[in-house]
From Swiss-Prot:
Family note: Belongs to the triosephosphate isomerase family.
A single GO cellular-component term on record: cytosol
Top-tier EC class: isomerase
Residues involved in substrate binding: N9, W10, K11, G174, S213, G234, G235
Name of the protein in its database record: Triosephosphate isomerase
Gene name in the database record: tpiA
Residues at the active site: H96 (electrophile), E168 (proton acceptor)
GO molecular function, one term: triose-phosphate isomerase activity
Organism: Hydrogenovibrio crunogenus (strain DSM 25203 / XCL-2)
Gene Ontology process terms (BP): gluconeogenesis; glyceraldehyde-3-phosphate biosynthetic process; glycerol catabolic process; glycolytic process
Task of the protein: Involved in the gluconeogenesis. Catalyzes stereospecifically the conversion of dihydroxyacetone phosphate (DHAP) to D-glyceraldehyde-3-phosphate (G3P).
Tagged with keyword Isomerase: yes
Length: 253
């Protein structure tokens, strides 16, 4: 039985005052979510501050991105995997659709980052997903297969035992639109099936989160699906009550 995992992606939001308020709210109810893994991923500049605000042992810390380079060096503006580890991160989000679309990250870039993260002892949260145009033109499966295959080619299928996958339909991110529970389940089952062709044992163990406008009012239905193992939460993770409610919905499964 896979443990459900809910991670909050704060994106480029927050300051010390708002983070203190948010984390105080999370700490107050962190023990109410049941047997659920919970993490928050603040902006890099606030990682250390957030860690110091979090109640030890209840909520894990993650980065939103990291450098492709495996060692520190002359890479202005970048954050290395070792730096994320040094401030207490366990996870790092890689391949988010915003990184792909806005910053031009390729499948090969993301695959290299996944390898660097794994080699550094971080658990990558690998984001995959299709645009509305790709879905409507029947390319959903080929797009997601290509995204997965790039990483499998780089690290091998066995390494996926240490990877979290987040399916994020690009058309449902920040739009208020959500894939139906059945639509999401169908894609999650497809992802697991693709991995199972190479290693059924690893496929069964891999946590596959759903990311795409998850809210307290739709979390239970999404998380009740057999191949949906939690969520990568954007906007709702900036509200302590909403994020805790989503985590509680995971804990009730």
């Amino acid at each position: 039985m896979r443990q459900l995992f809910v991670a909050g992606n704060w994106k480029m939001h927050g300051d010390k005052a708002s983070i203190k308020t948010l984390v105080t709210g999370l700490n107050a109810k962190a023990d109410s979510v049941g047997d659920v893994l919970v993490a928050v991923c603040p902006p890099a500049i606030y990682l250390d501050y957030t860690k110091n605000c979090l109640m030890a042992g209840e909520i894990a810390l993650g980065g939103q991105n990291m450098a492709i380079e495996p060692v520190q060096g002359a890479y202005t503006g970048e954050t290395s995997a070792s730096m994320l580890k040094d401030v207490g991160c366990q996870y790092v989000i890689l391949g988010h659709s915003e990184r792909r679309a806005i910053y031009g990250e390729t499948d090969q870039d993301i695959a290299a980052k996944v390898k660097t993260a794994l080699d550094s002892g971080l658990t990558p949260i690998l984001c995959v997903g299709e645009t509305l145009e790709e879905r409507e033109s029947g390319q959903l499966e080929s797009v997601i297969s290509q995204q997965l295959d790039a990483v499998i080619s780089e690290v091998g299928i066995d390494q996926f035992a240490d990877v979290v996958i987040a399916y994020e339909p690009v058309w449902a991110i920040g739009t208020g639109k959500t894939a139906s529970a059945q639509q999401a389940q169908d894609v999650h089952a497809f992802i697991r099936g693709q991995l199972a062709k190479l290693n059924p044992s690893v496929a069964e163990k891999v946590i596959i989160q759903y990311g795409g406008s998850v809210k307290p009012n739709n979390a239970s239905e999404l998380f009740s699906q057999p191949d949906i193992d939690g969520g990568l939460i954007g906007g709702a993770s900036l509200n302590a009550d909403d994020f805790i409610a989503i985590c509680q919905a995971a804990g009730e499964q």
